[in-house]
Every structure is written in structure tokens, then in C-alpha cells.
Amino acid sequence: MHAVLRERLAAVGLSLPEVVAPVGAYVPAVQIGNLIYSSGQLPMVNGALAMTGKVGAGITPEQAKELAQVCALNALAAIGTLCNLDDVAQIVKVTGFVASAPGFTGQPTVVNGASELFGALFGDAGKHARSAVGVAELPLGAPVEVEVIVALR
């Protein structure tokens, strides 16, 4: 399952992670018709946050961009619990939340970590609508959270 996507990930030196266990009373993803909505995904690696803190105060925008990519991979893993990821017809919407220090306004650059990954993996089908939002705090002290909506063939 997910053979084509796994090949594309390997070509850019990445792999699909295990699904992150929810940290609350929710499921990783929900399907309605041909749309799948991921829950917000944190930059969890092997069950722990890769980093904590705020972007612009201890975490650089470059580090946060890499963390957004981790979030995007975790979102794909969550979505993949409900479908074969090779059946994704379109990345519809990406919403990125960035825990931002006062005065930090580079949220779009941070969320590009997710957007650029989807472009690399899905080509034109990776082009999506997007919001990049600065927030005061995120769950568990995470610097970035990403949620994704995909359409299936």
C-alpha cells in the first residue's frame, strides 16, 4: 500500500512515519465522501516532539520549516489510515499554526515546509489552498501544527 508515494518519499530521502497516537479525545483523520481531513499534527518523531518552543525565540524559521515538513509527513500517515495514499487526487487545503514569539511574522515561510513537500510528492496535485497562522501557544509546547484536507480519486 502507498507504493508510489513511498517511492517518491525515498527519492527525496524521506519515509512515511508511523501514525502518531492522538494526545486527546479524537481520531487521526476522518473521511467524508472523497475528502479526508487530518487532525492537527505536531512534529512528533518516534512518539516525542522533535522540538518545543516558539519560532523567533529559540527556534529559527529554518528549523520550524523542517518541523512543518515533519507535521506534513505525520498528516500523510494519518490520512493513510483511511486510504491508499496513491489514490490522493489533490491536496485541497493545508492549515499551519506557528507558535510565534511577539513580532515574528514569518509564518508563511515556516508553513512552506509542508507546502513544498506536497509539491515535491504530488506535483500539480500538491498545489493547495492554505492558511498560515501565528498563535501564542500550541499543544505540548509544539512550535508548529499542520492539518490537511485531501480529495481522493
Task: List each language-model region with its residue ranges.
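Short, polar/acidic, helix-capping and beta-turn segments at strand->helix junctions
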Residues: M1-R153
